[in-house]
Amino acid sequence: MSEQTPAEAGAAGAREDACRDYQSSLEDLTFNSKPHINMLTILAEENLPFAKEIVSLIEAQTAKAPSSEKLPVMYLMDSIVKNVGREYLTAFTKNLVATFICVFEKVDENTRKSLFKLRSTWDEIFPLKKLYALDVRVNSLDPAWPIKPLPPNVNTSSIHVNPKFLNKSPDEPSTPGTVVSSPSISTPPIVPDIQKNLTQEQLIRQQLLAKQKQLLELQQKKLELELEQAKAQLAVSLSVQQETANLGPGSVPSKLHVPQIPTMAVKTPHQVPVQPDKSRAGPSLQMQDLKGTNRDPRLNRMSQHSSHGKEQSHRKEFVMNTINQSDIKTSKNVPSEKLNSSKQEKSKSGERITKKELDQLDSKSKSKSKSPSPLKNKLSHTKDLKNQDSESMRLSDMSKRDPRLKKHLQDKAEGKDEDVKEKRKTAEKKEKDEHMKSSEHRVIGSRSKIINGIVQKQDMVTEELEKQGTKPGRSSTRKRSRSRSPKSRSPIIHSPKRRDRRSPKRRQRSMSPNLAPKAGKMRQSGLKQSHMEEFPPPSREERNIKRSAKQDVRDPRRLKKMDEDRPQETAGQHSMKSGGDPKENIENWQSSKSAKRWKSGWEENKSLQQGDEHSKPPHLRHRESWSSTKGILSPRAPKQQHRLSVDANLQIPKELTLASKRELLQKTSERLASGEITQDEFLVVVHQIRQLFQYQEGVREEQRSPFNDRFPLKRPRYEDSDKPFVDGPASRFAGLDTNQRLTALAEDRPLFDGPGRPSVTRDGPAKMIFEGPNKLSPRIDGPPTPGSLRFDGSPGQMGGGGPMRFEGPQGQLGGGCPLRFEGPPGPVGTPLRFEGPIGQGGGGGFRFEGSPSLRFEGSTGGLRFEGPGGQPVGGLRFEGHRGQPVGGLRFEGPHGQPVGSLRFDNPRGQPVGGLRFEGGHGPSGAAIRFDGPHGQPGGGGGIRFEGPLLQQGVGMRFEGPHGQSVAGLRFEGHNQLGGNLRFEGPHGQPGVGIRFEGPIVQQGGGMRFEGPVPGGGLRIEGPLGQGGPRFEGCHSLRFDGQPGQPSLLPRFDGLHGQPGPRFERTGQPGPQRFDGPPGQQVQPRFDGVPQRFDGPQHQQASRFDIPLGLQGTRFDNHPSQRIESFNHSGPYNDPPGNTFNVPSQGLQFQRHEQIFDTPQGPNFNGPHGPGNQNFPNPINRASGHYFDEKNLQSSQFGNFGNLPTPISVGNIQASQQVLTGVAQPVAFGQGQQFLPVHPQNPGAFIQNPSGGLPKAYPDNHLSQVDVNELFSKLLKTGILKLSQPDSATAQVTEAVAQPPPEEDEDQNEDQDVPDLTNFTIEELKQRYDSVINRLYTGIQCYSCGMRFTTSQTDVYADHLDWHYRQNRTEKDVSRKVTHRRWYYSLTDWIEFEEIADLEERAKSQFFEKVHEEVVLKTQEAAKEKEFQSVPAGPAGAVESCEICQEQFEQYWDEEEEEWHLKNAIRVDGKIYHPSCYEDYQNTSSFDCTPSPSKTPVENPLNIMLNIVKNELQEPCESPKVKEEQIDAPPACSEESVATPTEIKTESDTVESV
């Protein structure tokens, strides 16, 4: 066993990893990326052993992907099938039709063209029958889609005469006789009709007809011979047939039809009505004959390939009529066809039949001529063929459907054919009515006939369906087959059908009914088909879900995955679907009710409440059992039974959680081999390891599947529920166990299919699993909505995976399932299991079952997470009624209590159990009351979901017990309005945490685990210590509850009520004060700074400082104790008792927070606040509960430990654990007194070291003791390394230590990176978390992505410098055209690389040299550019200096990419040479150019001289320069002066004027 287990576990782990990896990669395939598709194809090939799971993933992705992203997934499927094949080909073939239709329906026309091209490449890959079925289905959606006929060797409808028809023929004779006479009469008219049709069709088929002429002539001769023989036979059999005819109408019961259908049907048609009708109207007969031919099953055979798909939609409507008519017509046609056939052949009526068909005709005609009766079947076939030929008109209709003819016919003949058809229809309808009257019985017979003859040949699928289906199913199949066979039967019908088809079909598409008729019927008929075909419908639903989900989803990522999964949308969809075609759904074998609504997973869950479970289709039921086998427990079957029973508070040290089972077993074997451990020890350790991992695996599975269950849904199933949670490192919900999930998926589909789907939840209805395996934080994965809350994490579990599992239907929300917090079992982390119905709306409260775990039994309607109630929020809402809106986590009370406090009844009251959300009082504070064992002194203090749930950290603390401090999440106030508890902290897990924000509704409403919890988990240290979760400071989770509370600590602020209280705790440095937000005091709010339970309390701020002792004590053991204590944990002990109303103190859940100001700590003096509880200092012992003495006292609180959280309090002392007090609120309920712990025990709690908790559990149960024992053994033998020193306390708090261990473990993991340098394929294929973690740890270079550990900061700095140099060089070099030496020396090559070594770097001057060169070049360029330039004006413009009038030189500026004027500047729109402008400025400063305003009369020269004099006086430039300027260009100056003078004059004139 021990050896197999590891192997099996390894295989399961490999499967999960493979599926998880593939799923994540597949989700990135959002567009047609060939490299990505190639990569996924290679990955699929590498994971060939998991082909089924991967195929399920791909099909699920196809279903849930947006319409724009479906085609790439189809290309991926195509790539895998063509390049890998093998198992993948088989797996994809199974659901090929459903998958293809699912995509085809949702995409636009362009994508459909791509799909057609894709389909055209599959002829050599997929089975032809499968492709034919696919074509038929698609054709029913899009009549333009060609149906590729099956080759003769594959096609069931071969030309041979069907022996069944031959058997029938003897009965048919009478009709033939009559028919014969009528045919002669009708033949002439038929010919003209045929000719007309031919003229229409000939345009399209002239070439074909020419080729067929010879064949037709030969066939004619054969037919003539056959006709003679047939006449002789008919004469012989006429008497017999007549007798049968007489009997036929009345005597042919539908029952007979089923067995004898062929014969009876044939007889019937020929018998009574046929003759009279024929005799009555030759022309009408002709029409009928033509029509009949189309309807004739035999004709269909020939044309079935082409027209199959198209006709199907129409068939339904016309099935009855067509069948009757076809039967009648066939009889008529037989004789008429014979005559016509010869004429037609002669006239070469362009039978659309190809040579192949012609041959068929020949054989048929032969059979016809041979004997109308026996051959009649044959004849009917031949007739059909002939009629097809003769009825080229009809054929044209058919041809439209027939891919071969379609091309030509569609454009040219369609309009004509339509008109003709219309006319024929009217005539046919009349005839039909007549025939119907006479052949109602026949109709049935004909149907069966068709089924036997045509259907068999035409559609293997139909046959299978018939075989599989019961009579009801059969009727539906018949209808289908009929509709198929009628393809060619009635052109008239066809055209109308076609039209109807489109609109109705579309309608159907949009509605589930559509599925119901086709997919539904098929499913009904056969489960196997249902699996295949049902898939598509689910996929559609999933898509719809996606859409709606997208809107709902809070987290984009989750939206993406979860929503699609989400059943919610299904609700809407259901309504649409159900509205669409209830009839069709009814056909489904499931109860019509369930059938009508194609329920999405969660809806189904709801229906479960109604008892739909009973109506679940077998496969659903099967699925449930299946899922349970996976380890998902159904809500009813406690997980403990499935797996080991586990302590509710079970906490698994992080080292164990992170350790690889394989590695542990390997190392253990090595120790055994080296003699370090004995064989007995080896066996014990291996057994314990196996149990531990089995438990963890089970929890994961449970989480997943339940989770999925809830939403039955497809999506979820397909998807991992994990995905969403990938967030927390650990969180990763169950890790998804994708495989599991996938498997489930497969099972699920049927659900989708079946109307029965109803019970969606496979598992129980949804179980909520708070799995979080490792993660601490619980994450509510749920599809969330539907309420399922999944605490992934053990929630509390910090370390441990202890997942909490809300097993309940959870998803159900309303579902009748109870929610089950499985609790301990939860892995180590003790998951909480709400067993109760949880979602149920009323039904069944939840039950926290875990043994250890608490079982909230309460009637309460279960808590509803989010539930339908849905408060979206997400919080978890124990809604109780479900209905309750309230939200907060409200354990609603049995139902309703609005407040709904919920009562967790602990079934056993056991202490543990204790938590009972009584709900009753709900009202009052609505607090939840943990009735719990109530008395238990610490009794678990209320529910504290500490244990399991919160489990300390995470847990929510129900105040009562949860009083625990922080620890649990306390749903304390949950009612409080504030109420929401927000586990901010840990849970947050780091961010992951669950945030029960939602339900919350309550304002605070849900609890939100906001904090990141550093450790990832929350670390409520205090409360549970839980392993850790320690509210350690920030980490800790902060129950923000109120949300307001900022402090990390968990502040149960919001919870109000609970957290209302803030244990500020004086205790430590600061008094603890429960500050109620509301002032009410009542609520204690652990505000305080929230002290962090960091230090031993100290931390004054630490808000629960002590309470949990947190700090101080870390409840190390809590973890271990954890839930257990839960029950009792001291303080909370009573929680149960506590009504949780408010915590005792007033913590009522009122929201008010009571402020326990009391510095003293724990005494919560605070007003008792409304809460009933008085908390009055509970601690004070005052009332409140008292900590179980035992606990209390024990200083250890150890027991408290049990309490876990409260215990944490270890430090309590001072703080006294306010928590206890506070939490205690419960107490009063219990009546237990709160013994205040008083600091006196402050530390006490702490103790309980890990061990304590366990209290004795059954042997089969995986208790904390077992885990601790195993952990200590592994540490002792060196198999596991402690991430941090394991002091006694540490051991006690293994779980507690977990948070820090997480960090240490990360380091250890890095150190434990396996040596893969031997490159062994098997090893490289394994997933090593340590390797992956290594890839994501350290400082990452923003430029190249390299990572540097914290010890490599210097190297990182040098690395950044190197990037800078490289970037600078590249930038500089890019400015100039550069060259390189012909030969690069080794040093040059090396210099291109980053060199960290200082000495080497000193030698690496390559870039510096290049830089210098670049600098020189740029400097030269700068010199060249020292001249100023301005953009040139428009091309062709002559631009010159305003001063010297010299034309500027133009050049092309590379940087600006435009022509510039060299050595120029532009000033006020004028361009100058810089030197000219400089001179101009200098002179202008002297007013060298008199301004017009001055109108000087003096000679400009004098003016200039004066200026120069002035300039000389002012130390300016030397007079020489000035003189030079003036003298050098005297003429110029004079001219310039003159000009100005003139200007002045003018100006003067102007002015004077």
From Swiss-Prot:
Main localization, broad class: nucleus
Regions of compositional bias (Acidic residues) in chain numbering: 1301-1313
Posttranslational mods: Phosphorylation at Ser-120 and/or Thr-121 by WNK1 weakens its association with POLR2A/RNA polymerase II, promoting transcript release from the chromatin template and mRNA export to the cytoplasm.
GO molecular function: mRNA binding; RNA polymerase II complex binding
Biased composition (Basic and acidic residues): 308-318, 343-365, 381-422, 428-443, 530-568, 600-616, 716-725
Gene Ontology BP, a term: mRNA 3'-end processing
PTM sites of type Asymmetric dimethylarginine: R805, R820, R833, R929, R944, R957, R982, R995, R1008, R1092, R1103
Biased composition (Low complexity): 174-186
Protein name per the record: Pre-mRNA cleavage complex 2 protein Pcf11
